[in-house]
C-alpha cells in the first residue's frame, strides 16, 4: 500500500438533532408569521433559524487541524504479522493554555486504522489526560504483511449550544511496515551443515582447496586472493576461513503466479502468505547460521529494484550481517511480494528475473527456491536456474491439484519436496538436505 503525504482535510460539519429541530421550528415560525402577517412571529422565527446556522458557520470557519498537535509512536516497528504493536497517540493544542488544553480534552477522538491491523474487532483505546492534553493507548495485532497507515486522528467537536457538530481528520498517518511471520524451529544446524556443503559446480569431488575458496566480491580484502586458483578458474578467487558451512545462499521467492491473489482468507491468498513466510524463515535462519544470503523476488517487486546490480548480480545484494539490520534488509524485500500495485514500476517480469539468474551462481553457492508454481509450464523457467550452483533445493507450495512442479524440478537436477500450507517446514528441510533430528 502506498502512503501519500497527508494534506489538510476539510471538516465535515452538520447539524445535530437539536439543531435540525430548532431550524425546523424557526422556519415554521418565520413562514407562518409571514402568511398571517404577524411580523413579530416572523422575526422570532428568523432569530430561531439563525441560531443553528451561526453554529454551523462557526465550526466551519475554524478548522481544528492547524490548532491541534498530534504525535504518534509505534513499538515495535517494523513488526511481524501476528505480533502485538503498542500505539501511543498524544493530542494537545499547538499553543497550550488552560482553556485550550481543557477544550482538547473534551474532543471525541478516534483512530483511522485499516482492518488488516485490527481484524473485525472494534478498536478500544485507553484515554488518559496529560498536562498538555490527552493520550490514547491501544494495541494492534497486524494480520497481514504490507505497508499500512496508522491514522490520521479522527476528531468530533460540538458548538457551545450543541446545535452543530464537526468531524475532521487531524495529523498525518504514520506508516507501519509489517513483515511476514517467521516460522519457529525452521532449520536445524545439523541439516544446514550436512546439506549445504559448498563445492565447485561441475566437480564431483571438490578439492580441499576449492571448498575453502569462493568467488571474489566487491569489498573483499585483496590479500585473501588465491592467485593460483584464479588462474585455473579464470576468475578471482578468495580464501574463506569460515569453513564449508558458510556457503553463500541464494533464496528465490517465486510467487509471481499468485500476484494479486484474491481476498484475504481465500485459498490463493493464504498460499501466498505461507509461501512468503517460508522463504523469509529460510533466508533469516541461514543468515543466522553464518551463510551470506541474497533474496531474489521472481515477480520483480519494487522493493528489489533498488538493490539490483549492486554487486554485479542479477538479484538482490548479498547480506552478511547477522544482526537486526541484516534481518531487515531481507525481510523488507518480502513485504510487497505478490502485491504489485497497478502502474507500479517493477524490476522486470518473472521471465526476466529468472533468465537473469541462469548461469549467475558463483563458486559454492547454494540455490534455494520457494515456489508456488505448480504446472510444468510455470515451473520450467525456474527449473533451469542455478545450473552452475553446487546445490539446488526447492520447496513447492501446492496451490491447486496440479502437481507437476516437483517432477519437473527433479528432472532438472533439483532436490525438491512439497510443503502444503501449515506443513512441517523443519521436516521438509531435513528431507531436502538429509539432516537428522
Residue ranges and their predicted role:
Residues 1-4, 17, 218, 222, ...:
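Exposed, interaction-prone extracellular/peripheral surfaces
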Residues 1-71:
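Extracellular/lumenal glycan-associated context and N-glycosylation machinery
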Residues 12-17, 30-37, 117-123, 188-199, ...:
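Short N-terminal helix-initiation segments at or just after the protein's N-terminus
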Residues 50-310:
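An amphipathic, basic-hydrophobic helix/alpha-beta surface used to engage anionic
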